[in-house]
Amino acid sequence: MKLNEIADNEGSRKKRTRVGRGIGSGKGKQSGRGGKGQTARSGVRIKGFEGGQMPLHRRLPKRGFNNIFRVELSEVNLDRLQDAIDAKKLDASATINAEALVKSGVLRRAKGGVRLLGRGELKSKVAIEVHGATKSAIEAVEKAGGSVKILAPKKDEGEAKAS
């Protein structure tokens, strides 16, 4: 095999169809776009239109709703906590709460509160204050000799002003 003998596989580089180049090309005049009108112009795609067939988003039933009172909790796993303690970002002797987690960089923000999840292993004895925790997370913390305190959900600033 020589460098000047290397060639592409047959059909790997397909020739581009040049449209609008005369009636003899088979793609002249309307260039395969049908007649005139909106769809013959460039940059036109009617979102969700399926050629008159009932579109999928109308064939399927409506379902659910968006709860405006939904509280999104930031999630943190036990292994992330242990890594932060090992790296001396978190003080295991002090109470670990949302503020401490944000300050140490474990979480970026804890707007609605913090939920503790049970992935990983916790070796340090810690006191944790969170807004939610899984059973496995609570068991793992208590097994390591620590404690978990579940706080009441955070109130919105708007709700606090109203009352």
From Swiss-Prot:
Listed GO MF terms: rRNA binding; structural constituent of ribosome
Disordered, as annotated region: 1-43
Transmembrane residue ranges: none
InterPro entries attached to this UniProt entry: Ribosomal_uL15 (IPR030878), Ribosomal_uL15/eL18 (IPR021131), Ribosomal_uL15/eL18_sf (IPR036227), Ribosomal_uL15_bac-type (IPR005749), Ribosomal_uL15_CS (IPR001196)
Family: Belongs to the universal ribosomal protein uL15 family.
Role summary: Binds to the 23S rRNA.
Name of the protein this chain belongs to: Large ribosomal subunit protein uL15
Organism: Afipia carboxidovorans (strain ATCC 49405 / DSM 1227 / KCTC 32145 / OM5) (Oligotropha carboxidovorans)
Gene: rplO
